[in-house]
Curated annotation (Swiss-Prot):
GO terms for molecular function: ATP binding; phosphoribosyl-ATP diphosphatase activity. InterPro entries: HisE, PRib-ATP_PPHydrolase-like. Pfam families: PRA-PH. It comes from Bifidobacterium longum (strain NCC 2705). Pathway: Amino-acid biosynthesis; L-histidine biosynthesis; L-histidine from 5-phospho-alpha-D-ribose 1-diphosphate: step 2/9. This is Phosphoribosyl-ATP pyrophosphatase. Belongs to the PRA-PH family. GO terms for cellular component: cytoplasm. Keywords: Amino-acid biosynthesis, ATP-binding, Cytoplasm, Histidine biosynthesis, Hydrolase, Nucleotide-binding. It catalyses: 1-(5-phospho-beta-D-ribosyl)-ATP + H2O = 1-(5-phospho-beta-D-ribosyl)-5'-AMP + diphosphate + H(+). Its main location: cytoplasm.
Length: 87
C-alpha cells in the first residue's frame, strides 16, 4: 500500500527520470493550468462521491485528488515539508 510520502517519492523520481509513456511526466509537461484543472475536477468528483456514492468511491476520488495535488507540488518545486509546516 502506498503512503502520501511514498507516492511523493515515486512521482518525484518520475519527474527526474522522465520515463517514456509516464502520465505523470505528461501532466507535468502540460503545466500548471492543466494540473490545476485536474485538481478542480477531482475535488468536484470527491464531493459528489461523498454526497452520493459511499465511502469506498469517496476514498478512490480522494486518492486521485491527492495524486494531482502532489504533481502540482512537484511542478512548483515544493516538498512535503514545505506543506507540512502549514498544517
Amino acid at each position: 500500500m502506498k503512503t502520501f510520502e511514498s507516492l511523493f517519492a515515486e512521482l518525484s523520481e518520475k519527474a527526474q527520470t522522465r520515463p517514456e509513456g509516464s502520465l505523470t511526466v505528461d501532466e507535468l509537461d502540460k503545466g500548471t493550468h492543466f494540473i490545476g484543472k485536474k485538481i478542480i475536477e477531482e475535488a468536484g468528483e470527491t464531493w459528489m462521491a461523498a454526497e452520493y456514492e459511499g465511502a469506498d468511491r469517496t476514498a478512490e476520488e480522494m486518492s486521485q485528488l491527492l495524486y494531482h495535488v502532489q504533481v502540482m507540488m512537484i511542478k512548483h518545486g515544493l516538498t512535503l515539508e514545505d506543506v507540512y509546516k502549514h498544517l
